[in-house]
Amino acid sequence: ECGDWYARRLYQRDYPAYEAHLKKYGHPSQAGYKDVLRTWNPDKLDPAAYTRLFYEAGARYLFILGVHHDNYDLWNSRYQPWNSVNIGPHRDLLGEWATAIRRQGMHFGITFHHEYSWWWWQTAFECDSTGPYAGVPYDGRLVYESARGKWWEPYPLQWLYGISLREYKTMDEFVNRPEEGIFARHRDYARWYTTQWALRIEDAIEKYDPDFIYTDGNTLQPFCGIRTGTGTKSDAAQR
């Protein structure tokens, strides 16, 4: 589906993902990434078979993706309703991998990439600038509507896409990251976001007891990367 940044780039007309999404799912003002997740069904995925293959090739540990920048947890997440058990394949994919890896006698790690989700989804709040859908907002606008009567009820869409940062400061272009320090000026949102960031990591650790974890940034300051505002520090390392 056009790479691991497909979810962000399906809302950007200058990327191939936009055209690919248009042909397969429809215009992102009506069918966005949420609709990709709804129909996602990796029915050919067999963690046990892949684990045996990796072991025979010489691997003795595997890191498995827990969540990417798309903010969609690949386990039965306690703190993120947009997960692979509730929506999409209805499978605890991380749990399947953990079981297969342990049965093979290998070490097991989980990677977490949801540090960037707070800015990564800003493209979903944009719109086409030209063409028949010019000015029609993409489906990020739906985070401000009730989930009642929608196919994703009872899961708030805001928990997937987040909020439009235009609530805080008008930004006309999202090249990569918003300007430095935005969280420092909006402490309530920073506190909520960093708490959820840590709770989701702790939830996966408690459920699957990995030998290693990896997270973007580091375990002390989840928003320490280049040009990100540190906001409220959240330490998952204590667990």
Predicted region positions:
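Mature catalytic domains of secreted/periplasmic carbohydrate-active enzymes
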Residues: E1-R239
